[in-house]
A protein has these predicted regions:
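Helix-loop boundary and gating motifs at the non-cytosolic
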Residues: 2-52, 205-211, 219-233, 240
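Symmetry-related core transmembrane helices of the 12-TM Major Facilitator Superfamily/SLC fold
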Residues: 162-177, 365-380
Length: 386
């Protein structure tokens, strides 16, 4: 039987597989159900942004909660609460209630996100950390493919779709009980928590956090509204949902090679920084291609691929950078800030994208994306490697 770190890695990977398949089924399913109900793109975009708002709310308090109840209990709490919210989606079609349920689910999801990534970084051997974090990112990317694909297969009108989501979440929750007991962190009494701890992490890793913001903006923020983008271009509901799968496929393909490459850098910090610059430049190119989408709608497919590939790999590198530097509660703090900046990028993108798609999908929408990518590239280019 697997023991210690190996068992912990397997448990985190297994729970993540099932829970995120459920989550990535739920997100496009709810958006498409709102569209069928006649809800505007603006309101639907705000609903998508609620996901990131909940994550943004919980991350400042993650390290304090972990110190209070422990890492395993916190993970059980974060994995169990979404089960109740899906039961709520099954029982009501009230739009205000759906906003509340989505907020609760995203609070739990944010806590689980921080804990799972800190577990991976702590359980992974130092000489294999890049490939294991890359494998974890690949797993996440695969769930972004599988979840929307299952929605397209089951159909938005299927009475079994939400029940399938619930089954996936139950399976993921069960896997979390295999995580072994972990000793108290060495810095449990000395590390800062809450807002003070977050501020220390921001000061320690400002450029990494900016890269996390850009990754969140393109991979998850824009990814969450890809179905709306597809519908605005005249795609059917099934094809619009599959845009999410294309984005997820991009992150899946490149995460492990990026992690393996990062393990081989002679100067790891400098190598990661250089690769981040190239990835942000690629995102800028994809944003510029958005100006041609109204005339060439098929361009939306490679653009979605680049958003997922470059944005996801960018986040993988930031996660690896944090995991290579920190341990214990300090690692939870730094992971929380990384999740916070990634979430802030996703929240900004998803909340603005619906309005921009309603207003000017061919000009203002790509112009905003290009400005974000260009700003990120300029800061990364000018910043020294620490």
């Amino acid at each position: 039987m697997l023991q210690g770190p190996n068992r912990g890695l397997l448990a985190v990977f297994g729970s993540t597989l099932f829970q995120l398949v459920g989550i990535f089924m739920l997100s496009p399913l709810l958006l498409l159900m709102l569209n069928q109900a006649g809800v505007s793109n603006t309101v639907a975009g705000l609903f998508a942004a609620t996901t990131w708002l909940g994550i943004f709310i919980i991350t400042p308090f993650a390290s304090g909660l972990v110190r209070w109840i422990g890492r395993r209990r916190a993970l059980w709490l974060a994995s169990g609460l979404p089960l109740l919210t899906v039961l709520g989606f099954l029982s009501t079609r009230s739009l205000p209630a759906w906003f509340v349920l989505e907020l609760l689910a995203s609070v739990a999801g944010g806590l689980r996100w921080v804990l799972a990534e800190s577990f991976i970084a702590e359980f992974a051997p130092p000489n294999q950390r890049g490939r294991l974090i890359g494998a974890y990112a690949t797993l996440i990317g695969s769930t972004m493919v599988i979840g929307p694909a299952l929605v397209a297969w089951l159909g938005v009108d299927s009475p079994h779709a939400l029940w399938a989501v619930l089954a996936m979440l139950v399976a993921g929750f069960t896997w979390t009980f295999l995580i072994p007991r972990v000793p108290a962190a060495d810095d449990a009494d000395s590390a800062s928590v809450g807002l003070r701890g977050l501020w220390h992490a921001v000061v320690a890793h400002p450029v990494v956090m900016l890269a996390g913001f850009v990754g969140g903006f393109f991979e998850m923020g824009l990814g969450s509204v890809l179905p709306l983008y597809g519908l605005s271009l005249g795609l059917g509901a099934g094809a619009a949902a599959l845009l999410l799968s294309v984005s997820g496929f991009g992150g899946t393909v490149f995460a492990i090679p990026a992690g393996m490459l990062a393990d081989r850098f002679a100067d790891p910090a400098r190598g990661r920084h250089r690769l981040m610059r190239w990835l942000v430049a690629l995102l800028a190119g994809a944003a510029a291609a958005g100006f041609a989408v109204p005339a060439l709608p098929l361009l939306v497919w490679p653009i979605a691929l680049v958003w997922g590939a470059a944005g996801g790999t960018l986040y993988t590198l930031t996660m690896l950078d944090i995991g290579s530097r920190e341990r214990g509660i300090t690692l939870v703090n730094s992971t929380s800030v990384l999740v916070l900046t990634y979430t802030l990028g996703a929240l900004l993108a998803s909340s603005c994208a619906g309005v921009l798609l309603d207003w000017s999908p061919g000009m203002v929408f790509p112009a905003v994306l290009l400005s974000v990518a260009a700003t990120g590239w300029w800061v990364l280019w000018r910043s020294p490697v620490k």
